[in-house]
Amino acid sequence: MAPQRRAATKAPEGNGAAERRNRSSTKKDRAPREVQRLWQRPWLRTAGLGAGFVLTALLLWSSLGADDGVAEVLARRGEVVAGRFIEVPCSEDYDSHRRFEGCTPRKCGRGVTDVVITREEAERIRSVAEKGLSLGGSDGGASILDLHSGALSVGKHFVNLYRYFGDKIQNIFSEEDFRLYREVRQKVQLTIAEAFGISASSLHLTKPTFFSRINSTEARTAHDEYWHAHVDKVTYGSFDYTSLLYLSNYLEDFGGGRFMFMEEGANKTVEPRAGRVSFFTSGSENLHRVEKVHWGTRYAITIAFSCNPDHGIEDPAFP
């Protein structure tokens, strides 16, 4: 029950008090009339309505909690996923490429696991990315490091870090870094082969396979615009199976930056977690995008595989 207020004793009003009350009343009467006149101005009325629509849109966006409206979470950051796989119908993308029996996808889908790469391995492989990216970095929000080709984001361009830095690279990386990289790749390759019922030896590491570091800095070039929806098989013809190993944690290390499978009705999202592996067939059945990162820094490594040995690349070697 609300506490009762004791009524204040009113003092008798003199002429001065009455005049002050009349002036105050006049000001109050004038204020609504001034507001009314302002709203009668077309430009201000339009601006006010526009602000109302913007506010409504922002509230709706906040309530949905996703860039693309309705979304279902395939894997939450806080859960440990032993193994989750969803089969989806294969697209026709693979028909326009040379087929390899026992490898080219006939069973398509997407999977997530948190038990293939340990958190400790994820921390160690992230340190490899941090060491390499410390040599450069994009002016925009997305930087890449490709240990295979040597590509490194520097400003608005890319350099070959092996040629650009020469022997100094041996003071940045170690043989252990490259051994760990190879072991992580092998574990991911075996996971994909098992999930899709194919031989691991039929999968060939392909390009581009690279580290990514994303923050909230405004894009400076098209390479920084990582958030557009795309199909890997269309963007990179060599891709048959795509995987992502996350090296940082959603809502701990960064905000936004969730991975989204684009579907009619409801997108399927994967919330990054250090050590989490997300993998999928690379055709149009898995159209996807990444949310813009709103704060913090998101680290991941994209590891791609092809069924075509002509598109294969070797593991990077310590220089």
Swiss-Prot record:
Q: What is its EC number?
A: 1.14.11.-
* Residue intervals annotated with topology Cytoplasmic: 1-42
A molecular function (GO) term? dioxygenase activity
Swiss-Prot/TrEMBL cofactor(s) = Fe(2+); L-ascorbate
Residues carrying a glycan: 215
Q: Where does Fe cation bind?
A: 230, 232, 288
Membrane spanning residue stretches: 43-65
> Any idea where this protein resides?
Membrane
Looking at the record, the residues that make up the Fe2OG dioxygenase domain are: 207-309
Q: How is the cofactor bound?
A: Binds 1 Fe(2+) ion per subunit.
Could you tell me the superkingdom of the organism this chain comes from? Eukaryota
For this UniProt record, the keywords arranged alphabetically read as follows: Dioxygenase, Glycoprotein, Iron, Membrane, Metal-binding, Oxidoreductase, Signal-anchor, Transmembrane, Transmembrane helix, Vitamin C
Q: Which coarse location class applies to the principal site listed for this UniProt protein?
A: membrane
Query: What Gene Ontology cellular component terms go with this record?
Result: membrane
Residues on the Lumenal side? 66-319
Catalytic positions are 298
Write down the SMART domains for this protein, in alphabetical order.
P4Hc
Identify its protein family: Belongs to the OGFOD3 family.
The molecule here is called: 2-oxoglutarate and iron-dependent oxygenase domain-containing protein 3
Species, as recorded: Homo sapiens (Human)
Q: Which gene encodes it?
A: OGFOD3
